[in-house]
Amino acid sequence: MARSLAWRCCPWCLSEDEKAAARVDQEITRLLLEHRRQVRGELKLLLLGTGESGKSTFIKQMRIIHGAGYSEEDRKGFRPLVFQNIFLSVQAIIEAMDRLQIPYSRPESKLHASLVMSQDPYKVNTFETRYALAVQSLWRDAGVRACYERRREFHLLDSAVYYLSHLERIAEEGYVPTAQDVLRSRMPTTGINEYCFSVQKTNLRIVDVGGQKSERRKWIHCFEDVTALIFLASLSEYDQCLEENGQENRMQESLALFGTVLALPWFRATSVILFLNKTDILEDKVRTSHLATYFPGFRGPPQDPEAAKRFILELYTRVYAGAAAGPDGASKGPRSRRLFSHYTCATDTQNIRKVFKDVRDSVLARYLDEINLL
């Protein structure tokens, strides 16, 4: 400090060594100011949620809306993953048919099932005609359809029915995945992945972490300097169990994780954006699977998706309120944290575009205003 003052007021009073040290001090100060300006123009969002809640799909949507999107070459690169998802889905149904003792309705289906089961999904790069025909035939089997209707009893990718409904197109020679095919593709997130997007004058750094339990221990070093949390929760998992644990209800696990995250000291004053995702799957599922069977507290009509959405939002709101209160129900102390909730369909680009605009205009606005970027 004294050297810096002397350098500004009386530089000729300093020795050569002191002048050199002062120049280094000035350069360090300049670099720190430059870094501070860069940081001021960046917002860090932490993306959390249990496995298969839709985090990776949300990131893909951000790339489409605020990034470079997916060129034809990019989409071609997703072909093996689409084929893998199809094989994994059909193999899961075949295994479930045996376990649930559901018979095939066609005599040739057993041969087709054996052919499909002989393929290693993780080594698939093409969709050979014989496999495509076998999968198409199986999907027309009434027994396979009956097994699909019991999908809550086994683990099946959400995208299964989408891909199986587009088999003819996907099996064509020269197939190039569409943007929707890319959005529906599923690969478990492992480790920690960072994505940067530019929204107007703002740089958004979104940190996506693995949703499976085994991945959560890696989150800890992501918690510093977070502008806001985005927590994705699947509305449709109320009647499903964890893939890692066939006994634990997936929605209960998501609620527990939400409470754990809110209780962490790093997030006492961090705004929380709750995306209640997969509205499309919920709307279809409530027709045959009653929410009250798994959550007896639900008193609404059994086939009313709007009532189901409101009830599930209330479950998360209670967890949020509980995290803000002590054991006696009193507030733990003053906090500026707020909860912003939205219903989303992560595979619907227009829905995510609108929802994220709402998020930016509300949750992020005060941060952007502070750094004069609005």
Curated annotation (Swiss-Prot):
Residues 273-280 are annotated as: G4 motif. Residues 41-374 form the G-alpha domain. Residues 181-189 are annotated as: G2 motif. GTP binds at residues 49-56, 183-189, 208-212, 277-280, 346. One of its GO terms (biological process) is phospholipase C-activating dopamine receptor signaling pathway. Residues 44-57 are annotated as: G1 motif. InterPro entries: Gprotein_alpha_Q (IPR000654), Gprotein_alpha_su (IPR001019), GproteinA_insert (IPR011025), P-loop_NTPase (IPR027417). Residues 344-349 are annotated as: G5 motif. Keywords: GTP-binding, Magnesium, Metal-binding, Nucleotide-binding, Transducer. GO terms for molecular function: G protein-coupled receptor binding; G-protein beta/gamma-subunit complex binding; GTP binding; GTPase activity; metal ion binding. Residues 204-213 are annotated as: G3 motif. Pfam families: G-alpha. GO terms for cellular component: cytoplasm; heterotrimeric G-protein complex. Mg(2+) binds at S56, T189. Belongs to the G-alpha family. G(q) subfamily. Guanine nucleotide-binding proteins (G proteins) are involved as modulators or transducers in various transmembrane signaling systems. G proteins are composed of 3 units; alpha, beta and gamma. The alpha chain contains the guanine nucleotide binding site. This is Guanine nucleotide-binding protein subunit alpha-15. It comes from Oryctolagus cuniculus (Rabbit).
